[in-house]
Amino acid sequence: MRIFIIKSSTAHTAFDYSIKDIPGTSGRLDLICRSLNAAFQLSHSFRKNVRVYTVLYGPPDPPKTIRFEGAKIKPKTLNPDEVSTAKLIGKILNAGKDIKEPTKEREVLPGIYISRMTFEDVVRKNIKYNLYLLEENGVDIEKVKFPQDNVGFILGDQNGFTEEELNFLEGLVPKITIGPKPYLTSHVIAFVNIYLDRIGIP
């Protein structure tokens, strides 16, 4: 299984944004929509071997974490276009309005869950799955020997990670990179998926 943990410092945590202007009103939730597309969508099929956590820290009610389980998501629930994905995320956020317990997940749709887990909670929960932090100054991905069972990747948004978050991750997960420049999160996910396909990692 492949796991992607995407932390957004700005994406809204309530359905208070306009579908007509997702980038301008949602705290760059469009980045999350494109990342989900890159994680799951193939030309004529859907990746069932992928799990994605989107950890949202934008206003008005952070944190909110949405977990997407590719193996359980029903066909046509998660589509390639940003608008339908933004609507879906809005529906999920509405369903999680009244969640109080920090780590209790609520299944909103088959394979899609919402909780109040923090970024640190999500990392700790998945640390057994061989996590890697994707950063420009990491080890070249081509030099990494990945395990054949489960592997996970931690990615930031347009703002990256706070110093506190980097300190938390230091020594906990190794840093790797796909290249020397700051790439779009969705492009990094697409590259990682293609690279793992090429080297035969499930």
Swiss-Prot record:
GO terms, biological process: tRNA methylation
Cellular compartment(s): Cytoplasm
Primary location group: cytoplasm
Enzyme Commission number, as recorded: 2.1.1.257
Record keyword Glycoprotein present: no
CDD domains tied to this protein: TrmY-like
InterPro entries recorded: Alpha/beta_knot_MTases, TrmY, tRNA_m1G_MTases_N
Enzyme class: transferase
Reaction catalysis annotation: pseudouridine(54) in tRNA + S-adenosyl-L-methionine = N(1)-methylpseudouridine(54) in tRNA + S-adenosyl-L-homocysteine + H(+)
Chain positions recorded as S-adenosyl-L-methionine binding sites: L134, G156
GO molecular function, one term: S-adenosylmethionine-dependent methyltransferase activity
Coiled-coil ranges per UniProt: none
GO CC terms in record: cytoplasm
Keywords: Cytoplasm, Methyltransferase, S-adenosyl-L-methionine, Transferase, tRNA processing
Family: Belongs to the methyltransferase superfamily. TrmY family.
PANTHER family recorded: TRNA (PSEUDOURIDINE(54)-N(1))-METHYLTRANSFERASE (PTHR40703:SF1)
Subunit structure of this chain's protein: Homodimer.
Protein function: Specifically catalyzes the N1-methylation of pseudouridine at position 54 (Psi54) in tRNAs.
Full protein name: tRNA (pseudouridine(54)-N(1))-methyltransferase
